[in-house]
Design a protein with these regions (language model features):
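Pre-Walker A-like glycine/lysine-rich segment at the N-terminus of P-loop NTPase domains
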Residues: 2-67
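Conserved P-loop NTP-binding catalytic core
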Residues: 42-44, 50, 54, 64-126
Length: 237
């Protein structure tokens, strides 16, 4: 079940958007005991939520953001932001170097018993900027990250360097990137082996899906939940 969901710079949403299914500790909750699920001490999750707003207010784009997020788990394709999926104010022509193409997605879920996951993804027109998965076994505990990937080097080579940038789509840009990978439970030797196995970081897909294939329990459980249980669909009335 979803606890919290955040995203930024997606279609009509430029600023950070936050959505929570956590039931508030108010008298309203007590009047509707069938509208929430008690999963752990001090943790009640709403069963349903209604998103309301005027026409063209962003309701459909909110659902599209979840679909966009989910597709990288199902299709395992090249992870990057696309011009038609970032806010119009963040685009300056066709040149990704001139605009703000950084997109952020964060999903916190409860799966079963006292099993909580927090997944964070940042990407731009080059690829993944940051990706991490955290796990905790109780509400009062702190998240301990299962893995963390951070892009620590980026060199962009444009065939129009030295000339005034026109912002059109006639130039060709090549990116040279490097990442810092941290998997506490695997140790440095295994991290180095995984790093060498991924010959092209830029087009590697989500790291969590690779870790799931290697048998990491937490990466598999979260990825499986996103692919098979997260069902973002619109219901027009």
């Amino acid at each position: 079940m979803i606890l919290n969901y955040k995203f930024q710079n997606f279609m009509s949403f430029q600023d950070n958007v936050e959505f929570s299914m956590m039931a508030p500790n108010t008298e309203v909750k007590e009047r509707f005991p069938d509208n929430y699920v008690h999963v752990a001490p001090a943790c009640d999750i709403l069963k349903t939520a209604v998103i309301v707003g005027e026409n063209a207010g962003g309701k459909s784009n909110f659902v599209r953001s979840l679909k966009y997020f989910k597709k990288y788990f199902k299709e395992n394709e090249y992870v990057k932001s696309y011009r038609n999926r970032v806010h119009v104010n963040c685009c300056e022509g066709y040149c990704g170097k001139r605009g703000n193409t950084l997109q952020c997605f964060e999903l916190e879920v409860w799966l079963e018993k006292e099993c909580f996951y927090l997944y964070h993804l940042e990407m731009d027109f080059v690829g993944i900027v940051k990706e991490e998965l955290g796990y905790k076994g109780g509400v009062g505990e702190e998240y301990e990250y299962i893995f963390k990937v951070i892009r620590d080097q980026l060199d962009l080579d444009c065939d129009k360097d030295g000339y005034p940038c026109t912002g059109d789509n006639q130039c060709e840009t090549k990116a040279f990137v490097d990442y810092d990978l941290d998997i506490p439970s695997y140790g440095k030797e295994m991290e180095e082996l995984i790093s060498k196995a991924v010959t092209n970081w830029n087009q590697m897909g989500l790291f969590i899906t690779k870790l799931a294939i290697l048998g990491n329990e937490h990466a598999f459980r979260f990825s499986d939940w996103v692919k098979n249980s997260l069902c973002p669909e619109t219901n027009s009335v």
